Regions:
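Acidic/His- and Gly-rich active-site-bordering loop/insert found
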Residues: 1-110, 114
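Acidic/histidine-rich catalytic neighborhood of metal-dependent amide-processing enzymes
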Residues: 96-138
Length: 138
């Protein structure tokens, strides 16, 4: 079972890596690959949308309710290049840690968990595009 101190280290590692590859909205290709590679490593299923968005689900034993967790993915353009200045690197890292914790304890899970890594939170509006694609209906 994943221990809290190990989880903290994993989240910090994710944040450091994701901070170093900040990308603008709808062009989060390195970021998306990093997340997909990690989800593959921990054997969590997902689908991709809009080239960079990632949506996955961990099924609970009962599964009559579904709880969703979302993280933004994009950085901001600055005079020094693209940077994570709004904490999106932290949001993604925390969500990856939560996914791993839930996945490691899924035998205790009654409800379904959906996770959404949403591109273009800062613009041009990745959430609206994902909703139009029907991710909230699945």
């Amino acid at each position: 079972m994943l221990q809290i101190e190990n989880l903290r280290k994993i989240i910090y590692k994710h944040r450091k890596e994701l901070h170093s590859i900040a990308e603008i909205g709808l062009k989060e290709f390195k970021t998306s690959k990093y997340i997909r590679d990690y989800l593959d490593k921990i054997n969590v299923n997902y689908n991709t949308y809009l080239d960079t968005a990632i949506v996955g689900k961990i099924n609970g034993k009962i599964g009559t309710k579904t709880i969703a967790f979302r993280s933004d993915m994009d950085g901001l353009v600055t005079d020094e290049g693209v940077k994570h200045l709004c904490g999106h690197d932290g949001h993604m890292s925390i969500l990856l840690g939560l996914i791993e914790l839930i996945n490691d304890n899924k035998e205790l899970l009654n409800d379904n968990i959906v996770f959404i890594f949403q591109p273009a939170e800062e613009g041009p509006g990745g959430a609206n595009e994902l909703i139009k694609l029907g991710i909230m209906e699945e």
